[in-house]
Amino acid sequence: EMGAILAEIRDLGFDREGYLVHEPTRRRIDVVYERVDEDILYAELPELIDCHVEGKVHVLFAPNSEVVDDKGVEVFVPEMIRTYLGEEPLIKNAQTWSLAVPEERRYVMERFGELVVKSRGGYGGKDVMIGPEESRESIERFRRVVERNPTEYVAQELIDFSTHVLCEAREGSVVFRDSYADYRVIALAPDPKDPNVVEIVPGPLTRVAVPGKHVVNISSGGKMKDTWVLEN
């Protein structure tokens, strides 16, 4: 429906004028929505940088934008807003401690089993320990991993976030249960001449966790579901 091309890196190339093209169809590509590691993308398509700089293609995740995905950066975002924008943050961060900071590391290690400890570079719910949900043995095992390289980890308070009622069919009957849910609002800017015009899609991307767990990532057992906002 979008007319978008699903392509692998090997399907991409450049024409004589330096524009990115889809080799099988020779269609020029205007926008790249990358779902691979940027190091791999630019290593295999080094010309993409120049193409991007010259305005011949737009890349949804520009080079090095992954720095904002680093959970270690999140700790310092409120102070970055104050320093570089001269403003107070409008939305508060979840309380987060960086194990790269000695005082914060000591605090986290003293309360290790009470907190959520996660790798800065982890994704998909991997390399995360939710202390209150783990056994003592699992907590101690994860503690030893963290102690080997503490600067690569951050810790947060466990947030008891929203739940959503799920309807499941089991052996001919219907079962309702609560599950922790993560809602991702989709905001669109439809007017290229006025970036202040923003429309919110009335249905957030919703991920739900395995019963009794907080991790909603699909790769860690979570599921997707539909959610629709019927009224403002």
Place the predicted regions along the sequence by residue.
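Domain-scale recognition of functional cores that engage charged ligands
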Residues: 1-232
